[in-house]
Amino acid sequence: MNATIEELLKSGQMLLNTGNPKGAMTVYDKILEISPNHIDALIKKGNILGKLGKYDNAIIYYDRVLGEESQNILALLNKGLAYHYIGQYQIALDCYEQVLMIKPRNVTALYNKASSLVKSKRIEEGLKVLSDVIEIDFSCKVKAKFDIDFTSIQKNNEFRKIVL
């Protein structure tokens, strides 16, 4: 008996939860054999590839999702993160801007935007966005204090005012 896509999704998630990303990847591949444009399987596969540091490959899967659903917020956020991690901050910022056009107060997009701005040496802009996102979600204040992306500005007086 063949497993249904729903059963396969549950199995893949269980494998991920128990620390078996390769097994989960195999399950998501099975789903994609059955349904090549299955959004959840494409996103999960992109996530696994991203966690394995294979950002270029992850982006391919997020692009496939966006080919089906151009306003898929999760795919846009994850694609932005993948570009951020490979140092292509402007493309990452473009992804976050697309999310913010759909959901202007999306905390993840705003926080990631601040991070990419700082990493691209646009410190003042990044600090403004960081300050704005902290107004929406105070937990971002604590997160920013310890975020590796902000280590280069730890001694910046404006950053210290925002996070301390």
Where are these regions (language model features)?
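Canonical tetratricopeptide repeat
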Residues: K10, K44, N78, Y85, ...
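Alpha-helical segment of the N-proximal tetratricopeptide repeat
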Residues: A3-D40, K44-N57
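Helix-start (N-cap) detector for alpha-helical repeat units in TPR-like alpha-solenoids
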Residues: I5-E6, I39-D40, I73-L74, V107-T108, ...
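Terminal, low-structured helical/coil segments at or just beyond the last alpha-helical repeat
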Residues: M1-I5, S11, E135-L164
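Position-specific recognition of the canonical hydrophobic site in helix A of tetratricopeptide repeat
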Residues: L16, I43, G50, G67, ...
